[in-house]
Structures are given as C-alpha cells and as structure tokens.
UniProtKB/Swiss-Prot annotation:
Gene coding for it: sprA
GO CC, one annotated term: extracellular region
Gene Ontology molecular function: any one: serine-type endopeptidase activity
Species name: Streptomyces griseus
Name recorded for this polypeptide: Streptogrisin-A
Signal peptide interval: 1-38
Length: 297
C-alpha cells in the first residue's frame, strides 16, 4: 500500500464559517435613543438539500487529495486537504461553492491521502500485503472481509480466493477461506491477546475507536466525521467513509476498525504515519456485510 493523494490504505477535517451576531451593543443603542432599533436577523444555515448540492459541487471540482463531509447541525462542509493540494486548488473548491449557503471549513493533513497496500493480521498476494478486517460467515461458509482496493489486485490470496470486490465508489472485498478452521472471529491486538467481535454497528462522531493492522499493529483514536467523500486522485473516489484521527501506514489497508466487541469499519486510506499522526478513512463494515449477506463470526 502506498500513500497517494487521498487514497485507500492497502499492503489493510472541514471549515471556516462566518456567523452574523447581534451583540449587546444593539440593545444598548436602542435604550440610548428614543426610536426602537430592530436587531438584525440571524443568518440561516444551509439545509440538508443545500449541503448535498454543495457536496456535489466539490465533487465536480475534482481536486485530488481532498476529503469532505457535511454537518447538518451546523450547515457546514468540513474539508480536509492533504499536502499535495495547492492554494489554487483550494481556491477552486471555494469558487465551486460561490453562492452556496453552505459554510466551508478547511483543514490540512500532513502527507498524501492514499490507499495502503503493503482481523488486523497480514494477508498477501504476489508482492502486495494488506490486512484482514473481520472474519465472517456467508451461508455458513467462512470468509474474510478486507479493503476492495486490496481485492482488486488479485483473485488469489494467501488465505483463499476472492469472491467479491468493490472499489472505487466503495472500498470492500471478500475472500473465501481455503482453510475454514483457521477463521477466527476475534481481532488480534498485537500484544499476544485478542478482542472478541460479537456484532457490527455504525460509528458516531466522537466515538473512541481502535484499529488493528499488519504494519503498525494496534492504534487508538476517535471518529471525527461520517459519510466522508474521499478523492484518491487516479485511484478513484470513495463515498460514505468514516473519518478518524487514528494513524495508519501502507499495509494496514483492509484492517479492522472497532470499538470494544463491535466491528465498525475496514481501513481504506489516509495520510500521515504513526510517528507524526494522520487522518484516515474507513469503509463502514455494515455496508460490506449487507452487500455479501454476511455476519460476523
């Protein structure tokens, strides 16, 4: 897995808003003069529909190395730009929102957004390495979920044979175990112990999470955004991602994102590293489970 501009992680954040404020000075002025002064109306925030239109405008601007999500509660779009995005490209994004009520917040991320190829443990094909996300059952048969940008590489893997893959747009894939007895429903924590996974769920902003991957082991952090769109440049665009501040590096792609015994996501990509930190994106696992009719072991 190699970091590109916003790209997936295989080998397995948005922006300034101006507020119109009626200060106490207005009230003071009203008291000091005989005539009443009407307080200015508060600026209305963007609606869900307007936010969706603004998100589509950013998508059409097609700036590689950017990722963004909307906040209906604030009327904002939060956009994260990796180190490859120039000021001119950020201006292109801003211009795309000209006339929109959506407020843009821009954050910077170190390094490139890229997919990382290099249950957390390593799976390999040819010269590429990714990480296993979660072992699952499909009609009673043991399979493994990982990142789609990993399963796109080859049909034959160290643990079995690919039976499905979806990337770009999504980032999930599934491999049928050649040795079903080896399929463990737990996630390896890289300290000699394992975490039982008993269910799958949906992440929420602020949630404390952990990620397991074959390059950097077990790492912790929190969810910073949901339903993020990530432009990985030539690798493609993915939608509906979970955004976090958990670090990851090439080879962690496809690895497990979880909270306690709940499976949450599959490592897609990001920027930075585990020395200086980073921004990462994850395919929601519930979508992958639904696509393949699978359940966690």
């Amino acid at each position: 897995m190699t970091f590109k501009r916003f790209s997936p992680l295989s080998s397995t954040s948005r922006y300034a808003r101006l507020l119109a404020v009626a200060s106490g000075l207005v009230a003071a002025a009203a008291l000091a003069t005989p005539s009443a002064v009407a307080a200015p109306e508060a600026e209305s925030k963007a609606t869900v529909s307007q936010l969706a239109d603004a998100s589509s405008a950013i998508l059409a601007a097609d700036v590689a190395g950017t990722a963004w999500y909307t906040e209906a509660s604030t009327g904002k779009i939060v956009l994260t730009a990796d180190s490859t995005v120039s000021k001119a490209e950020l201006a292109k994004v801003s211009n795309a929102l000209a006339g929109s009520k959506a407020k843009l917040t821009v954050k910077r991320a170190e390094g490139k957004f890229t997919p990382l190829i290099a249950g957390g443990e390593a799976i390999t094909t040819g010269g590429s390495r990714c990480s296993l996300g979660f072992n699952v059952s499909v009609n009673g048969v043991a399979h493994a979920l990982t990142a789609g940008h990993c399963t796109n590489i080859s049909a034959s893997w160290s643990i079995g044979t690919r039976t499905g893959t979806s990337f770009p747009n999504n980032d999930y894939g599934i491999i049928r175990h050649s040795n079903p007895a080896a399929a463990d429903g737990r996630v390896y924590l890289y300290n000699g112990s394992y975490q039982d996974i008993t269910t799958a769920g949906n992440a929420f902003v602020g949630q404390a999470v952990q990620r397991s991957g074959s390059t950097t082991g077990l790492r912790s952090g929190s969810v910073t955004g949901l339903n993020a769109t990530v432009n990985y440049g030539s690798s493609g665009i993915v939608y509906g991602m979970i955004q976090t501040n958990v670090c990851a590096e090439p080879g962690d792609s496809g690895g497990s994102l979880f909270a306690g015994s709940t499976a949450l996501g599959l490592t897609s990509g990001g920027s930075g590293n585990c020395r200086t930190g980073g921004t990462t994106f994850y395919q929601p696992v519930t979508e992958a489970l639904s696509a393949y009719g699978a359940t966690v072991l």
